From Swiss-Prot:
The keyword Transmembrane helix does not apply. Transmembrane segments: none annotated. Belongs to the glycosyl hydrolase 17 family. This is Major pollen allergen Ole e 4. It comes from Olea europaea. Keywords: Allergen. The N-terminus is blocked.
Amino acid sequence: AFANTGVEIVSIDTYLFSLYDEDK
């Protein structure tokens, strides 16, 4: 997540983080 070691992880993390951020 915070440690971008892969494009896939970054994409998924960004997506989930967006939902989490909007959810607050």
